[in-house]
Amino acid sequence: MNIDDKLEGLFLKCGGIDEMQSSRAMVVMGGVSGQSTVSGELQESVLQDRSMPHQEILAADEVLQESEMRQQDMISHDELMVHEETVKNDEEQMETHERLPQGLQYALNVPISVKQEITFTDVSEQLMRDKKQIREPVDLQKKKKRKQRSPAKILTINEDGSLGLKTPKSHVCEHCNAAFRTNYHLQRHVFIHTGEKPFQCSQCDMRFIQKYLLQRHEKIHTGEKPFRCDECGMRFIQKYHMERHKRTHSGEKPYQCEYCLQYFSRTDRVLKHKRMCHENHDKKLNRCAIKGGLLTSEEDSGFSTSPKDNSLPKKKRQKTEKKSSGMDKESSLDKSDLKKDKNDYLPLYSSSTKVKDEYMVAEYAVEMPHSSVGGSHLEDASGEIHPPKLVLKKINSKRSLKQPLEQNQTISPLSTYEESKVSKYAFELVDKQALLDSEGNADIDQVDNLQEGPSKPVHSSTNYDDAMQFLKKKRYLQAASNNSREYALNVGTIASQPSVTQAAVASVIDESTTASILDSQALNVEIKSNHDKNVIPDEVLQTLLDHYSHKANGQHEISFSVADTEVTSSISINSSEVPEVTQSENVGSSSQASSSDKANMLQEYSKFLQQALDRTSQNDAYLNSPSLNFVTDNQTLPNQPAFSSIDKQVYATMPINSFRSGMNSPLRTTPDKSHFGLIVGDSQHSFPFSGDETNHASATSTQDFLDQVTSQKKAEAQPVHQAYQMSSFEQPFRAPYHGSRAGIATQFSTANGQVNLRGPGTSAEFPEFPLVNVNDNRAGMTSSPDATTGQTFG
C-alpha cells in the first residue's frame, strides 16, 4: 500500500470530499492568498518524494495537546466564556469545520510563505476536531434536548462594557414578589408564608420546611456530631459551627464594624456591637445636634439654657456656666440662692400629705430687726434687736436635723410664699416691747396685712381622726381624769433674753402623729413631746387607735358647741423655767382702750378667776357633765389661769398623748385665722391676751384681790353657766401669780389636777378670746377690746 492510499483513507475518515475541497481554498488564515497558491503538480511531487509514516500521524496528537495548552494561555478567560456561551448551534459548528484547513497535511514540509502561527496549530486543531466529530452526531442530539430549558445564567454586557451573568427567575412568589429560578424553590419558599412544615421529627414533634433541616435536627437526638475540631477535639453538629469555633484558636476576625473598623470573629457579635454602640450613639448625636441648635439660638438671643435642656453633666455644666460670662455667674448664684431658700422654708410649708410627724419645733427665738413693722416706732424701741431666727428640728425615723432659718429684713418671710401652699408651720414674728410702745398706732395694721398672706386652711389631712379622737370619746378622758392622769397644753417656758420674745405651745400628742389644729382657716403647730410625763395609759391609746383606724382620710365637716362637746385641748401656764423679768412685754395688737373699758375687763376677769378657783376646789362635781377640761401639768403649778378656745363654727383641737415641753414659738395671727379662741361671754369681738402697759396705776394688794374674788363667788348664782368677758388684769393682781415652781399656790392643786370650765348652752353666745402670748416675767395678763382686729392663738 503506497502513501497515497494511506493519506486518502485517513482524510476520508476525517471528512467528506467536498469538505476537503472547501478547506483547500482556505489554507491561508492570515490573508496572504498569493503566497498560498501552490500548483498541484508541485504538491504531488513533494508527497511522492517523501513518505509519511504512521508514527508521525500518531505523534500529531501529542503536538495537538501541547498546542491546546499554549492556546489556552493565549486566550483570555472572558473570550473563553464568550466562546462557550455563544457558539453552540450546528450551523456555527459547520462553518467552523469548513474554515479549518483540511488539506494542510499535504504541505507540512513544503517551504511556502505562510504565517508562523497557523502552520502547526491549525493542523493540530483540525486533527483533534476530526476525532471528536466521529461521536458528535449522537451526543449532540442529547445535549440539544437538555439545553432546551432556560439556562441558569445568561451572559450579558453591562452599560460600562463589562461582561455580566444574569440569572433568569421566572417563578415569582404571590405573597412577597420574590422570584425563583425553579418551581421547587418557589414552593419551598411559599411554606414560609403559609406556615406549612411538611417534615416532622419523629422524636420531638418539631416540624421543618426543608428536609435537610430535619436531618440536621435529628442529629441532636442521636448525639451525632460529625464535625470535629482538630486542635481541641470539640465536636459539632454543623460544619459552620466548627469553622466558627476554629476562629477562636486562630484568632481570626474576619468581620469588621463599618463604623469603628473594629474586627470580630462572629457575625452576631458584630450586630450586637453595632446595636449597643453605634445605633444608640447615633441617636444621642442627633439629640445633641438638635439641642446644640437650640443652644446656639438661645445664646444668640441672649438667654441661658436650662439644665434640663443641656446634655452635659451637672458639674461640667456649672463649670461651663462659670467660665462663660458674668451674667451666667449671676444667674447661677440666683438659682443656688433660690434653691437654698426653698430648702430652708420647706418644713414650714409641707403639704397636707406629709403631715405625719415630720417637723417638730425645737427652739424658736425671735429677735426683731430695726426695720420691723411699726416703722420708726419699732426702731426707737430697742437698739439691741437682731434679725429673727428660727430653728426647726426634723424628726423622721430616728434622725434629727436642725435647719436654721435666717429671716430677712421684713417682718416675716412667710408672706412671700404662694397662696396655694399649705401653711403647716406659720409663725408671725412680733416684738412685744415694740408693739407696746406703738400700741394704738396705725402702723400696726401693716402687721395684720402681712400676716394674712401665708395663712391657708389645712384641707384633707391624715391626722384629722387623730385630732378628733378624744372629742367623741368622753369616757376615756373621764377615766383618765379619775386615775389622776394629767393632760396639759402648756403656754410658757419662756427664757430670759434681752429683747428676745420666746413662747412655746406644747401639746400632749401621740408620738406617731402630728399635733393638728384643724380650723377652717387655722395654722398648724407641732410641739415636741415630753417623754418624762406619764399621761395616758397604753391600753387607752390602743383602744383609740383601733377605733379610729377604719376612718377614711379627709376633713370632716363637724360643728361643735360647748353644750354637748367636751373640750380636750387643755391649756395651762408653765412657769418652771420663767425667771423674773422686770420689763413687761406686749405681744398682740390692740386698739386704743379707755380706762373704763379696762376697768370693765378687770371686773369680768376677776369673775372668771373666781369661777376657775371654785371649779378647782370642786372639780369632781363637774366631771360627769359636758364641760371644758383644763388640766394643769402638775399639781404644784402657780395660780395661773388655763384657757381653751372653741371656734364658733369649727372646733380645733389636738390629740393628747404625751407632753412636749421646752417648745418656744411666738405666735400672732389675724382674727380669721384662729386656732385657739376662748369663747367666754357675749361679745362678738376677739379679745386677745396682752401684757399690760408699762405704767400701772393700780396698787391693789393680793389680799384685796382674794377678798374680791370671795365676795364675787358668794354673789354668783350659777357660777358654772355664767358667761364672763376677759378684762385687763393689772400688774398688782398678777404679782402673786408669777412665782417660781417652788412657791406655787394651792388653788389649782386638786385631787386630779384639773380645772373644769363650762360655758353657756349654745356656742353662738361665746365670742373669741384668743390667747396671743405670755409675758416672760409672768407678771400678769391684760386684754383690751379690739372691735376690728381680734388676735388668736396660732
Curated annotation (Swiss-Prot):
Zinc finger (C2H2-type): 171-193, 199-221, 227-249, 255-278
Cross-link (Glycyl lysine isopeptide (Lys-Gly) (interchain with G-Cter in SUMO2)): K6, K88, K115, K132, K291, K308, K356, K402, K421, K424
GO biological process: regulation of transcription by RNA polymerase II
Keyword vocabulary terms for this entry: Acetylation, DNA-binding, Isopeptide bond, Metal-binding, Nucleus, Phosphoprotein, Repeat, Repressor, Transcription, Transcription regulation, Ubl conjugation, Zinc, Zinc-finger
PROSITE patterns linked: ZINC_FINGER_C2H2_1 (PS00028), ZINC_FINGER_C2H2_2 (PS50157)
Modification sites for N6-acetyllysine: K607
Main location per the UniProt record: nucleus
Region annotation (Disordered) ranges: 298-338, 575-596, 775-794
Subcellular location: Nucleus
Protein family according to the UniProt entry: Belongs to the krueppel C2H2-type zinc-finger protein family.
Organism per entry: Bos taurus (Bovine)
Superkingdom in the source lineage: Eukaryota
Maturation and modification: Sumoylated with SUMO2. Desumoylated by SENP3, resulting in the stimulation of transcription of its target genes.
Protein purpose: Involved in transcriptional regulation. Represses the transcription of a number of genes including gastrin, stromelysin and enolase. Binds to the G-rich box in the enhancer region of these genes.
Annotated Basic and acidic residues bias: 321-338
Oligomer and partners: Interacts with HNRNPDL. Interacts with the 5FMC complex; the interaction requires association with CHTOP. Interacts with CAVIN1.
Location of Phosphoserine modifications: S51, S250, S301, S306, S412, S665, S784
MF annotations from Gene Ontology: DNA-binding transcription factor activity; RNA polymerase II cis-regulatory region sequence-specific DNA binding; zinc ion binding
Biased composition (Polar residues): 575-588
Protein name: Zinc finger protein 148
Covalent link Glycyl lysine isopeptide (Lys-Gly) (interchain with G-Cter in SUMO1), residues: K356
SUPFAM superfamilies for this protein: beta-beta-alpha zinc fingers (SSF57667)
CC per GO annotation: nucleus
UniProt modified residues of type Phosphothreonine: T194
